[in-house]
Curated annotation (Swiss-Prot):
Homodimer. Interacts (via SAM domain) with STE50 (via SAM domain). Interacts with PBS2 and SHO1. ATP binds at I421, G422, S423, G424, S425, F426, G427, S428, V429, K444. One of its GO terms (biological process) is cellular hyperosmotic response. It holds the Pfam family Pkinase. It catalyses: L-seryl-[protein] + ATP = O-phospho-L-seryl-[protein] + ADP + H(+); L-threonyl-[protein] + ATP = O-phospho-L-threonyl-[protein] + ADP + H(+). Present with 736 molecules/cell in log phase SD medium. It comes from Saccharomyces cerevisiae (strain ATCC 204508 / S288c). Keywords: ATP-binding, Kinase, Nucleotide-binding, Pheromone response, Phosphoprotein, Serine/threonine-protein kinase, Transferase. This is Serine/threonine-protein kinase STE11. Serine/threonine protein kinase required for cell-type-specific transcription and signal transduction in yeast. It is thought that it phosphorylates the STE7 protein kinase which itself, phosphorylates the FUS3 and or KSS1 kinases. The gene is STE11. The modification Phosphoserine is found at S323, S465.
């Protein structure tokens, strides 16, 4: 039993748990001289600060506080508790903001201490030494590794299966010691690039570089720990939270002493080459060695010279301005050269210009090599007057005014293979360059295991066209999810990939439109089947969403309009894409939409339009229309539904039905459930989506009809 002394000197006995908080209400009423109401407060159980601070006029009248003066005193005092609470919250917020500010400042100072230069990364070698490497201008993993390999001591170079020393980048790996999981993390290529170019990743000061046949040694791990402790030491200046990190590090050090660290990402080799970015053409032109790391440098230089000359010939013969959108390396370099020359000419005095300048000569494009003589120059001397090579002949001769201009882009007879920039439905996509013209390309490639598989040529085009429907029907029978499944061997799957690639080639030959990726041709070489496609600098809708988040509605309407224009063109050609989704919509750096990946597209003919056969289940599940899921019809209206799903992607940053698995999504779509329309879309945008998601495909509008929708007219930008 607790005893409390009151102001009058009498003892107040509190004998049960219900009245444990009486001292507060009693002191509250005593302070303002209203103790006569104490019994009323106790009877209504208004005894704590939380209950008293919410008192109002009506409650006080109900408690029997009838005097206005008493009510005012009680209310004024109770409201002061709320003010005190708000002041306390504000002070706590200020303290929190000060801590965050000090954390940011300390982190910056820490980074500047550990990584003195902005573009530098510290690599730890297996002998425990460390190398600081400037990665400025290296935008893929191969170029970063290549820059370090040139500085490796001979004893740390990798050896191949024949025991020979190798400097090939694929023979080296990069690890980072993850102290939170106590594992050695084997970095994917994209992880390495991200860490090297991020300003806030402290791992960039302790990357471990080893040959592929080795794992990080104890010396390398020890050096990594020392650098990590320096990081913790810098963090310890921020606040008490760093003490936990220090304690954690001690535990890790103890655990590491007991045994070997576990290596994470052991399955890295499966996707180590995927670097899903499409940099601008001008970016590539300034870092050719980085984007074509496996290409012989002399061959690359020869291609650059020929491309530059080719562009100069056409520019003079046609008197054409150089296109700002060209993907031709020669055009880009010539444009840069002309821009510099023009700036120099404008700075000359007009009188000196007329007397000293010979306008019949074209200035040569020459770039000096960097100070580092060991570094392979990324800027090439394209026109050298002193060069005695056979291919360096002067192209301003007797026939300089007779120029043969190509009417269309021909299939490249020789091309250079660059970095992997993505993957499609079948095979990988690489950056490529026409070795003769310097034109950049995206090359879709799949390995051919069966030598009797050939690429259709113009001579057998008609035969392939006649057999196309039969092959397509057979392919659909194999791929049909709803059909009875048979065991699939690797050979059958591989054959399907090659068939799909040939099918895509047959379709792309017929397509010539601004919003469809351009087809340059195909070839079969070195056990690979290649499709040469237009290189679209920028990226896909899905990659943009991953990088930047959902789009503004005005941008969505702009992209949707272009998608529908491309879809309308396909439908006019009786072609159904069947895989319209964000990953297959490319956006170049000028905002132009390009539809790509026709691996499962279908060309309708009058014959299969009339056939009443079960449709195949083809496409990406979350973008499928009800008639495709139910396998009731194969019509162009499926692309309209998928386009609506892409609009949902752009609004939300996620695919439709993001909370469901593929099987759950199939069930939802099959039971006539439409994707949820974003509540923040405009009324016209919602109406557009409702029309695109019309369940009955016969009433669903066509692409041309949707292009006339008011939503697309209201936001023309």
């Amino acid at each position: 039993m607790e005893q409390t002394q009151t102001a009058e000197g009498t003892d107040l006995l509190i004998g049960d748990e219900k009245t444990n908080d009486l001292p507060f209400v009693q002191l509250f009423l005593e302070e303002i001289g209203c103790t006569q109401y104490l019994d009323s407060f106790i009877q209504c159980n208004l005894v704590t600060e939380e209950e008293i601070k919410y008192l109002d006029k009506d409650i006080l009248i109900a408690l029997g506080v009838n005097k206005i003066g008493d009510r005012l005193k009680i209310l004024r005092k109770s409201k002061s508790f709320q003010r005190d609470k708000r002041i306390e919250q504000v002070n706590r917020l200020k303290n929190l903001m000060e801590k965050v500010s000090s954390l940011s400042t300390a982190t910056l100072s820490m980074n500047s201490e550990l990584i003195p230069e902005k573009h530098c990364v510290i690599f730890i070698l297996n002998d425990g030494s460390a190398k600081k490497v400037n990665v400025n201008g290296c935008f893929n993993a191969d170029s970063i590794k290549k820059r370090l390999i040139r500085r490796l001591p001979h004893e740390l170079l990798a050896t191949n299966s024949n025991g020979e020393v190798t400097k090939m980048v694929q023979d080296y790996d990069v690890f980072v010691l993850d102290y939170t999981k106590n594992v050695l993390h084997l970095l994917y290529d994209v992880e390495l690039v991200t860490i090297c170019h991020a300003n806030d990743r402290v791992e960039k000061n302790r990357l471990i570089f080893v040959s592929k046949d080795q794992t990080p040694s104890d010396k390398a791990i020890s050096t990594s720990k020392k650098l990590y402790l320096r990081t913790l030491s810098a963090l310890s200046q921020v606040g008490p939270s760093s003490s936990n990190l220090l304690a954690q590090n001690k535990g890790i050090s103890h655990n590491n002493a007991e045994g070997k660290l576990r290596i994470d990402n052991t399955e890295k080799d499966r996707i180590r080459q995927i670097f899903n970015q499409r940099p601008p053409s001008e970016f590539i032109s300034t870092n050719l060695a980085g984007y074509f790391p496996h290409t012989d440098m002399k061959r690359l230089q020869k291609t650059m010279r020929e491309s530059f000359r080719h562009s100069a010939r056409l520019s003079i013969a046609q008197r054409r301005p150089l296109s700002a959108e060209s993907n031709n390396i020669g055009d880009i370099l010539l444009k840069h050269s002309n821009a510099v020359d023009m700036a120099l000419l404008q700075g000359l005095d007009q009188t000196r210009l007329s007397s000293k300048l010979d306008t019949t000569k074209i200035p040569k494009l020459a770039h000096k090599r960097p100070e580092d003589n060991d570094a392979i120059s990324n800027q090439l001397e394209l026109l050298s007057v002193e060069s005695g090579e056979e291919e360096d002949h002067d192209f301003f001769g007797e026939d300089s005014d007779i120029v043969s201009l190509p009417t269309k882009i021909a299939t490249p007879k020789n091309w250079l293979k660059g970095a992997c920039i993505g993957s499609g439905s079948f095979g990988s996509v690489y950056l490529g360059m026409n070795a003769h013209t310097g034109e950049l390309m995206a090359v879709k490639q799949v390995e051919i295991k069966n030598n009797n598989i050939g690429v259709p040529t113009d001579n057998n085009k008609q035969a392939n066209s006649d057999e196309n429907n039969e092959q397509e029907e057979q392919q659909e029978k194999i791929e049909d999810v709803g059909a009875v499944s048979h065991p699939k061997t690797n050979q059958n799957i591989h054959r399907k990939m090659v068939d799909a690639l040939q099918h895509e080639m047959n379709l792309l030959k017929e397509l010539h439109h601004e919003n469809i990726v351009t087809y340059y041709g195909a070839s079969q070489e070195g056990g690979n089947l290649n499709i040469f496609l237009e290189y679209v600098p920028g990226g896909s809708v899905s990659s943009m969403l991953n990088n930047y988040g959902p789009f503004e509605e005005s941008l969505i309407t702009n992209f949707t309009r272009q998608i529908l224009i491309g879809v309308a063109y396909l439908h006019k050609k009786n072609i159904i894409h069947r895989d319209i989704k964000g990953a297959n919509i490319l956006i170049d750096i000028k905002g132009c939409v390009k539809i790509t990946d026709f691996g499962i597209s279908k060309k309708l003919s009058p014959l299969n339009k009339k056939q009443n056969k079960r449709a195949s289940l083809q496409g990406s599940v979350f973008w499928m229309s009800p008639e495709v899921v139910k396998q009731t019809a194969t019509t162009a209206k499926a692309d309209i539904w998928s386009t609506g799903c892409v609009v949902i992607e752009m609004f939300t940053g996620k695919h439709p039905f993001p909370d469901f698995s593929q099987m759950q999504a199939i069930f939802k779509i099959g039971t006539n459930t439409t994707p949820e329309i974003p509540s923040w879309a405009t009324s016209e945008g919602k109406n557009f989506l409702r029309k695109a998601f019309e369940l009955d495909y016969q009433y669903r509008p066509s692409a041309l009809e949707l292009l006339q929708h008011p939503w697309l007219d209201a936001h023309i930008i």
